[in-house]
């Protein structure tokens, strides 16, 4: 292979890595809403698997006041976020031995 050809391949690889990093950031910042029970419960989650908001229709829990419902929504979001962080930490710990020595791009996690 000619010297110029190798330089071109390296440049393409760098451009692809930059595009992948940009796409990973866009995906991480994306927000989706999941709904259940005919929209009586909804959850807004980011691409980083962070629960941003939980909404529970008051009719699901009759007799529960608005303040208690808001606290329940916040506690549910916090519990799910805690579980997600624990799964991520466990995955990184388990995969650490497999990926030891590999030069992964910043922010790239295994498994994908």
From Swiss-Prot:
Q: Which Pfam family is an annotated match for this chain, by its short name?
A: YbaB_DNA_bd
Q: Which InterPro entries does the record match to this protein?
A: YbaB-like_sf, YbaB/EbfC
What are the protein's UniProt keywords? Cytoplasm, DNA-binding
A single Gene Ontology MF term assigned here is:
DNA binding
Got a GO cellular component term for this one? cytosol
The keyword DNA-binding is annotated on this UniProt entry: yes
Localization of this protein: Cytoplasm, Nucleoid
Domain of life, per UniProt, equals: Bacteria
Q: Does the keyword Hydrolase apply?
A: no
Q: Which family does it belong to?
A: Belongs to the YbaB/EbfC family.
PANTHER family referenced in this protein's UniProt entry, alphabetically: NUCLEOID-ASSOCIATED PROTEIN YBAB
Subunit note: Homodimer.
Described purpose of this protein according to its UniProt entry: Binds to DNA and alters its conformation. May be involved in regulation of gene expression, nucleoid organization and DNA protection.
Q: What is this protein called?
A: Nucleoid-associated protein PFLU_4577
Q: Which organism is it from?
A: Pseudomonas fluorescens (strain SBW25)
């Amino acid at each position: 292979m000619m010297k110029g050809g190798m330089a071109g391949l390296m440049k393409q690889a760098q451009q692809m890595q930059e595009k992948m990093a940009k796409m990973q950031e866009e995906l991480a910042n994306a927000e989706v809403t999941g709904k259940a029970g005919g929209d009586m419960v909804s959850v807004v989650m980011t691409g980083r698997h962070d629960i941003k908001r939980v909404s529970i229709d008051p009719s699901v829990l009759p007799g529960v006041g608005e303040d208690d419902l808001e606290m329940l929504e916040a506690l549910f979001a916090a519990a799910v976020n805690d579980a997600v962080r624990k799964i991520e930490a466990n995955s990184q710990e388990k995969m650490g031995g497999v990926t030891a020595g590999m030069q992964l791009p910043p922010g790239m996690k295994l498994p994908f």
